[in-house]
Amino acid sequence: MNKKLLFFKKTAALLLCAVLLLPCSACFNSPEAKNPGNDTGQITDSPHSETRNEAFNDYVNRLFTETVTTDTITLHSYMEHPSDFGIDNYEVTLGRYDLAGLDNTSDITGKLTALKSFDRTTLSPKQQITYDELLIYLQNELEYSDLFLFQTSLCTTTGFHVQFPLILAEYTFEEEKDVKEYLALLEDSDGYFQSLADYEALRSRNGYFMEDALATQIVGECENFIESAGSPDSYLITTFDEKLDALTGISDADKAAYKTANQAAVTGHLIKGYRILTDGLKKLTGTNRYQGGLCNYPDGEKYFRYLLNHSLGWSKSVDEYNTLLDSYIRSNLLTMQTLMAKDSSLSSQFNNFSFSITEPAAVLTDLKTKIAADFPQGPDVSYDIKYITEALQDSVSPAMYFLPQLDNLNINSIYINPKGTRSSQLYPTLAHEGYPGHLYQTTYFADSDPDLIRYLIAPDGYVEGWATYCELFSYSYADTGTPLLNTLAQANYATILCLYAKCDLGINALGWTESDVTSYIADFGFTDKNVAHEMYLSMVSNPGNYCKYVLGWIGFSELKKEARAQTGSAFSNPDFHKYILDMGSVPFDMLFDRLEDWCSVQSAQ
């Protein structure tokens, strides 16, 4: 939320993972590692140490601590008991934008200098992965550091103003300290929103403020929250009361006082903060100098390249990504045509295609059973299925997974938006959010005892690309009795995903207008201009968002193609998926660079 967190991109608003909204489609250990020197499962031919470099371990843990303590929402989202991680003294704050120091790169250069002071050959294989990932991350941040004013936490559907109430509702109370800190954060919220409004005013003065239509939409989302949050039965009141009542060791009188304080903080600070933001946005409406995608702004195309590099870490140009998307569209359309030519009844069957299991708990149970044949075993953890409160259903994604605390891996929450998810499509949605998607990948990664800093620099393209890959994979589990029908539905959905990423790329890198989007999707049978309008505004508001999901999935698909080609009959889905999961969330260049060594080992077995 402040300057430092702008570089580490894991602010509280990003501590959840959401499934894409497609209107035209039918995070652990203490700083002292548990297994020093145990780096089994890592494939490397580079010179390395057989044991852990303790100085490097201290460095990355110190870097993690410095970052998560800059605001308490982030700190609490990552850990319930900071003292177990050696964190005892921290300010309870939401943080602030450092408007005077936004262009100061000394923070990044200092981190790079410290990182490069380590001899990579003295690091263990696991530490070398951390080193490489951190080096790529910091170099990318430094290269594009002059574009800081493009960054904003306000965008439709996934913006901070939408996610913050959900983060507050998920704030865990394990002891009285949590209650006190939560109330202090609520009381700090108006100050934070003032800082956010001031930052947007700075962006406006420099020509980077959002289009009027987007500002109006975000103001509307804020006003909807204000209207609902002030009522006595507001979910921020009821969830607080429920969590507080479940705590032991607090007297009834103290609980009553805390409840009164919460009501006062919601109305006197949180709602006030949202009003400060809406008033600020209304004043700035009409000040935008540019229209459309990022490429219409000075250096906008460069910033879009930064977004792709940041989320994917894949050495490809915009033109190469564009070509990849075209090839996947052609390939999936050809698959559909071939299947329907083989069995003409598939066309009519496809119109009635659906997943037979529609109850969330049953879906996750079925997925956990079926993935055992295709994915390595992960840790056994618990999870809760919850529903988005009605006040936010029009604003948020169809579903989302909240990352668990590092010391509370059994507390996993999946939220379903009843307005955004049809019951017949709940199966792939929960494959994305649950098994083998976010929940499974997150807890698998945690079980590998990674360096904690990796949670803060995890590329979104890996995280969301993996979940999208799993979402598509789940079509093979549909109980239709007709595998060809499942493949047809999978290819259809894959095509739609590619169309969205193609428009994201077109709008933000190639200068597509709304009419270009309308014409493009019409060629594929989507003639509703309202859909094109929604797509256009969504991609102008949140550039690169669709690309990280879709190009991330394509990255894993390209990895699989290469692995199949190199290993031949030795290829297996469980082993391939284990390679990806054992590496953890890293840039795609790292996955491709190490693939040949892994394939050699597989072929020799």
Predicted regions and their residues:
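Hydrophobic core
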Residues: 16-21
